[in-house]
Amino acid sequence: MTNQYPPQQDRPQWYAGSPYPVAPPPMPQPTVMPVRTNHAMHLLLSLITCGMWLPVWVIMAMINSGRTRKVY
């Protein structure tokens, strides 16, 4: 195949290597994990405090049920 356009002296030639830059590797996707309540610790605290810790345990379990965390 012949060159359709002859090279010109005042314009740079096209680089015949890689016409496009190499794409960067994709970013790692975070893993979404639920936040878990430590029930053993709350049970122990409830037993030690004779049940005074139960409202805190219930509130923490309700709050943590809808929470998630991202691990990269």
Curated annotation (Swiss-Prot):
Q: Which domain of life is it from?
A: Viruses
- Protein name in the entry: Gene 35 protein
Native species? Mycobacterium phage L5 (Mycobacteriophage L5)
Q: Which gene encodes it?
A: 35
